[in-house]
Amino acid sequence: MFRLRVVLAAAALHGLVGCVTDPTLGVVDWKHGARRGNVVSTYTADLPVTQLPKCLADLPRDQYTTNRYVKVRYRNVRLTRSAVAQVPPTLDIKDGDVIELWPADCEAGSIARITRVLSVKGQ
């Protein structure tokens, strides 16, 4: 009887673990520097240069207005960091989406890369 209870408890626990596992874990290329990030906001084309981060303010204005840029938050060890990334024209990215990010230092003038959408907000 005791053994049956242990087996049933283990089966229930195993079933619950599947409910809380994030499906995007394990699909990011961590080994080569990619991170799992959340899109926080989109930089609009009409935003004044004084309100842009350094890497976007340094771009020629026509390059800034013809491309889409987003602010992304990602975790690096225990710290939450922010990055500015250009949205590839082939991807439809919205605020709240989870993406694969290749971080870069915006203060040094570098813009991060987004390679794919891992999950869409609301799904």
Residue spans for each PLM region:
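C-terminal motif of bacterial Sec signal peptides marking the signal peptidase cleavage site
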Residues: 15-18
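Bacterial lipoprotein signal-peptidase II cleavage site
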Residues: 20-27
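Bacterial N-terminal signal peptides that target proteins for export
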Residues: 1-8
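Intrinsically disordered, glycine/charged-rich N-terminal periplasmic/extracytoplasmic linker segments
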Residues: 41, 55-123
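Short coil-to-beta-strand transition motifs
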Residues: 27-41
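Short, conserved beta-turn/loop elements at beta-strand boundaries and strand-helix junctions
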Residues: 42-49
